[in-house]
Amino acid sequence: MIKTCATGGVLSESDKVDSPQLTQAELDALVDEAHALGRKTAAHAHGAEGAKRAIRAGIDSIEHGSFLDDEAFELMRKKGTYFVPTPLPCIMQRLRDAKAPANIIQKAAAADGKALDTLKRAIAKNARIAFGSDAAVCPHGTQLNQFEIFVRSGMKPLAAIRSATSVDAALLGVPDRGTLEAGKLADLVAVPGDPSRDIAVMEKLFFVMKGGAVVRNDRAGVASAGTTTGSSAAGH
């Protein structure tokens, strides 16, 4: 995976969050060369113009996309581009706690203020939404709250789960995982309930299997019947 910054960022001090960072020609060359090497490509892009340049270049995914407009979503539909939104409820408090510079807090507030509206429009337009983490911005694992955010924004619960399983596998080009099928990696999680009815249970993982090996089992030692009643499993 080759990732580029098509627009400014939230945590950088000197640029505008939505300003384009690369020309169309530069993005065309970047994507062409990456794809020639068999690499997937992703673009950090908050602003619409920078994102549209990346989409026209054939980028595989747009990350964040806080200020995407209707033209951007139409281009994504035509090009088959994935959208990886990163609605992070923790970010504003994290920045305040860290005593971040005022301009960074201002940029974060602008992006955060548009993120949910953009996500709702993306869902309404049937965008190809994949699940991302924006790793290290919020503590690892807290991103599980995105399942509930996706559903509150209009996505069906099973579609939200697929965004983190089969959709992510397709985006990243890893066909040996993402669905529960013979011959694929046994990557499983279990939750205490039915996430198709209550997506919030996705934040209550108690069992994790990676490649057929159990790496977490909070119910180890509990009778077999007790471990299965009222629980659901999902494949990664």
Per-region residue spans from a language model:
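Histidine/acidic residue-rich metal-binding segments in metalloenzymes
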Residues: 1-83, 110-129, 178
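C-terminal cap of metal-dependent C-N hydrolases
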Residues: 164, 182-226
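His/Asp/Glu-enriched, well-ordered alpha-helical/loop segment
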Residues: 36, 40, 100-103, 111-195
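Active-site loop ensemble at the mouth of alpha/beta enzyme cores that anchors a bound cofactor
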Residues: 82, 86, 90-109
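Conserved residues at the C-terminal ends of beta-strands
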Residues: 5, 65, 133, 192, ...
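Short, charged, surface-exposed secondary-structure boundary motifs
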Residues: 70-77, 93-96, 200, 218-220
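Short, acidic/turn-prone active-site loops that include or flank metal/cofactor-
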Residues: 65-70, 87-91, 213-214
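Catalytic metal-binding/acid-base residues of hydrolase active sites
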Residues: 46, 88, 136
